[in-house]
């Protein structure tokens, strides 16, 4: 039976990975290549002024609607959260959203029967309705698809494997669109032109939309959702206004978001204009595929290189160094002209560090959760982690608007070729493509370098302070014990190993009982189980510690290793979420002991009763040095009369 289960789940991973491929292929053509079709092919009445006016209006409509959609996103999330039916929590939205969005996007790659030439105003209204409908249904599909990952399995290892398949599918899906777009469009076009024609773009869009449609139905029919307590305890979806409020209160989150905003606008504009450069400046649209292939591999290399750089350099150093490297690429771009090798060098220098910049910003935003918790007294994890996707969408929206306008100003609209672009048009284009993004990157460097002080060391200090003060939120918890007339409580160990008195732990804070009395275990395995029925009240983002408030009134902090916050979650797995109720024996955390030892850290697992002052005494039920199994009773706590 186990082999059959594994076989089925491997199939599920493949299907989910294929779903990610279709999802990102769809997003790639929506966010980048629909604009190219609109500016270069859609409007062709022979009246240049009318065509340019339509391009300008349509691209502005897209920009405005994409910004409006940011405020609709929270309602989409809430609608998905409230969905309860037999097919599942997420799969119906993946199928319905994928179907509707694919059909409508394909319609947008047509001239809607020449409607714009008959009545421009009606065309604009119809286009706006179709676009916002398509965008909303795609958001339903996108949110549903990525949110369903935890529901596919309760096994954390399987989640990691499935997520890896999804990331691989996502990289392939988004990257291959860039590789194939111009060769495919030109191949399917009826006319032999350097930019293709309406038929070529429609057939290419048809292929991508079919992939997106089939992959959505594949996920809907080929995966199964598992019900669990984690999903029942899912936090509410975050609204845009709540995000702004969180930014105003958390200065490190605010500055990281601002730096990422300027950076995001810059890279989105330059990235969106690269295909225009190959097409209208160089006259070599097919060569854009070479850049896309290079970027796929460089993205994978950059991601694997990041852990090495982050150990040798500070976050500010990595962030500034990456952006300076990108500025060097922009500088080479300005003198590259039509030299393919110089252009490829410039474009790869610009694209290579982007994954590393993303990871630096993600680390700061993630660490700002604990920073805000210490500063404000409450934890806004969902708010903080909603900031980056919001900025990504906003940057993409601004990019769409700018690209449409610069295409008109530079003369890169319907019927244009590389030879028809004037010197003035090239100058306007290059100023927008190079000077403006360079300015955005310089501003981002300035903000990040001057305002961000949330280093890994600072974050470790914050986590340590939160561990010291965590108990103050749960004073007088033994009142519920007194009501039950309980005079003593047994405290079990959450992990197997050798018992160590707390005073012998190699940490003065724990050893002195500053965080409360308790005991420690030299672990013999890496599974942390709930020692009693309890509610999870704290799960650190580094997954090295968990705080429980027991149904019996005991407030317990379980801390894996000493100095392990520095590992930033590497080698640790969390099976629970804040607010989740667990029963004795449920698995809370898991860690890979060799990771801790290879980092030169102490792997001792420490348990402190942070409300130990509410008990009169603690008696040992086992001898120090004795080997115990998980959930064996270690201490007996006596309540106050």
Swiss-Prot record:
Its main location: membrane. One of its GO terms (cellular component) is plasma membrane. The keyword Phosphoprotein applies. Pfam families: MFS_2 (PF13347), PTS_EIIA_1 (PF00358). GO terms for biological process: phosphoenolpyruvate-dependent sugar phosphotransferase system; sodium ion transport. It is a multi-pass membrane protein. The PTS EIIA type-1 domain may serve a regulatory function, through its phosphorylation activity. In the N-terminal section; belongs to the sodium:galactoside symporter (TC 2.A.2) family. This is Raffinose carrier protein. The gene is rafP.
């Amino acid at each position: 039976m186990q082999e059959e289960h594994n076989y089925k789940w491997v199939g599920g991973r493949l299907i989910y990975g294929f779903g990610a491929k279709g999802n990102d292929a769809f997003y790639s053509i929506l966010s980048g290549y629909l604009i190219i079709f609109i500016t270069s092919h859609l409007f062709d009445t022979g009246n240049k002024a009318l065509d340019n006016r339509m391009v300008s209006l349509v691209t502005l409509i897209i920009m405005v609607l994409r910004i409006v959609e940011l405020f609709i996103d929270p309602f989409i999330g809430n609608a998905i959260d409230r969905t309860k039916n037999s097919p599942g929590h997420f799969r119906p939205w993946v199928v319905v959203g994928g179907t509707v969005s694919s059909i409508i996007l394909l319609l947008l790659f047509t001239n809607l029967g020449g409607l714009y030439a008959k009545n421009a105003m009606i065309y604009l209204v119809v286009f706006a309705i179709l676009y916002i409908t398509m965008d909303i249904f795609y958001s339903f599909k996108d949110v549903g698809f990525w949110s369903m990952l935890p529901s596919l399995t309760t096994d954390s290892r399987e989640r990691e494997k499935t997520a890896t398949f999804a990331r691989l599918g996502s990289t392939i899906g988004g990257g291959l669109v860039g590789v194939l777009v111009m060769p495919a469009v030109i191949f399917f076009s009826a006319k032999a032109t350097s930019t293709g024609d309406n038929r070529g773009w429609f057939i290419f869009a048809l292929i991508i939309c079919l992939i997106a449609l089939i992959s959505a139905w594949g996920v809907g029919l080929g995966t199964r959702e598992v019900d669990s307590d984690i999903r029942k305890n899912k936090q509410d979806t975050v609204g845009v206004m709540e995000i702004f409020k969180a930014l105003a209160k958390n200065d490190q989150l605010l500055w990281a978001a601002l730096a990422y905003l300027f950076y995001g606008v810059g890279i989105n504009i330059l990235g969106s204009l690269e295909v225009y450069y190959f097409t209208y400046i160089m006259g070599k649209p097919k060569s854009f595929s070479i850049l896309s292939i290079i970027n796929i591999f460089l993205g994978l290399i950059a991601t694997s290189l990041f852990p090495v750089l982050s150990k040798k350099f500070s976050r500010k150093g990595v962030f500034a160094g990456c952006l300076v490297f990108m500025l060097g690429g922009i500088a080479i771009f300005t003198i590259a002209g039509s030299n393919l090798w110089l252009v490829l060098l410039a474009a790869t220098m610009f694209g290579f560090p982007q994954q590393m910049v993303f990871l630096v910003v993600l680390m700061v935003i993630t660490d700002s959760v604990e920073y805000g918790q210490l500063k404000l007294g409450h934890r806004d994890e969902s708010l903080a982690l909603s900031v980056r996707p919001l900025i990504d969408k906003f940057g993409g929206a601004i990019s769409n608007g700018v690209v449409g306008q610069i295409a008109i100003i530079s003369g890169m609209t319907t019927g244009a070729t590389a030879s028809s672009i004037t010197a003035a048009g090239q100058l306007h284009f290059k100023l927008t493509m190079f000077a403006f993004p360079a300015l955005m990157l310089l501003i981002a460097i300035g903000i990040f370098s001057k305002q961000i002080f949330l280093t890994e060391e600072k974050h470790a200090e914050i986590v340590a302070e939160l561990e010291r003060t965590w108990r103050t939120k749960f004073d007088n918890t033994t009142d519920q014990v007194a009501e039950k007339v309980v005079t003593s409580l047994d405290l079990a160990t959450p992990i197997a190993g050798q018992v160590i008195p707390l005073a012998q732990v190699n940490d003065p804070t724990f050893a002195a009982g500053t965080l409360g009395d308790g005991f420690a275990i030299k672990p013999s395995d890496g599974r942390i189980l709930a020692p009693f029925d309890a509610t999870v009240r704290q799960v650190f983002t580094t997954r090295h510690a968990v705080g429980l408030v027991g149904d019996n009134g005991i407030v317990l902090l379980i801390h894996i290793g000493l100095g392990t916050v520095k590992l930033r979650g590497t080698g640790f797995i969390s099976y629970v979420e804040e607010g989740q109720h667990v029963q004795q024996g449920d698995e809370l955390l898991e860690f890979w002991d060799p990771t801790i030892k290879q980092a030169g850290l102490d792997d001792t697992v420490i348990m402190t009763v942070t409300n130990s002052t509410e008990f009169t005494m603690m008696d040992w039920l086992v001898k120090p040095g004795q080997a115990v199994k998980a959930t064996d009773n270690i201490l007996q706590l006596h309540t106050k009369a």
